Amino acid sequence: MKREKKEQIVKDVAEKLQKAQGIYLTEFQGLDVEKMAELRNEFRKAGVEYQVAKNTLIKKALENVNGGDRLADGLVNTTGMAIGYDDPIAPAKIIEKFGKKNEMLKFKMATIDGSVFEADKLQVLSKMLSKTENIGRFAGMLNNVISSVPMVINAVMSDLVSVIDQVAKQKQD
């Protein structure tokens, strides 16, 4: 590969990594073309990009990424990068699920907002709630609070009316 082509790949990958909220390194050696296409499709559905490049080029691209120096330690054998732009947890869920069915896909390391996670932390990451799940839970909690406010106001008003009625009855007697 010509030097200009390599430099362009490094530049493109570096731009993607700068935008990423989560970067996951995987080993895919032994995955056939059909399984790789299936994996890429799963990533695409979740808004995650899966990129394969030479380790030396990935290492160059990681130089300006927060936590990239430690992530570079995982660049051995074949390396694929799952890049999560909107949801840093989505790649972990897909890698965990897909890896259970296909043992050839192995999680190496990940970085989320500068924090580096080793291979043994994949299950922890995959069980975390995604951004959309967290937003959904928060919206549900807000909805409960908002729907409770009228009930509380009605209860207070009812109690107030009852107290006023009792005071009025006492004054009449």
Curated annotation (Swiss-Prot):
InterPro entries: Ribosomal_uL10, Ribosomal_uL10-like_sf, Ribosomal_uL10_bac, Ribosomal_uL10_bac_type, Ribosomal_uL10_CS_bac
Coiled-coil region(s): none
Keyword tRNA processing: no
PROSITE patterns named in the record: RIBOSOMAL_L10 (PS01109)
Gene Ontology CC: large ribosomal subunit
Any one Pfam family match given in the protein's UniProt record, by short name: Ribosomal_L10
Keyword Ribonucleoprotein included in the entry's annotation: yes
Molecular function GO terms recorded: large ribosomal subunit rRNA binding; structural constituent of ribosome
Biological process annotations from GO: translation
Keywords: Ribonucleoprotein, Ribosomal protein, RNA-binding, rRNA-binding
Function: Forms part of the ribosomal stalk, playing a central role in the interaction of the ribosome with GTP-bound translation factors.
NCBIfam families reported in the protein's UniProt record: PRK00099.1-1
Family: Belongs to the universal ribosomal protein uL10 family.
Subunit structure: Part of the ribosomal stalk of the 50S ribosomal subunit. The N-terminus interacts with L11 and the large rRNA to form the base of the stalk. The C-terminus forms an elongated spine to which L12 dimers bind in a sequential fashion forming a multimeric L10(L12)X complex.
Protein name, entry field: Large ribosomal subunit protein uL10
Biological source species: Chlorobium phaeobacteroides (strain BS1)
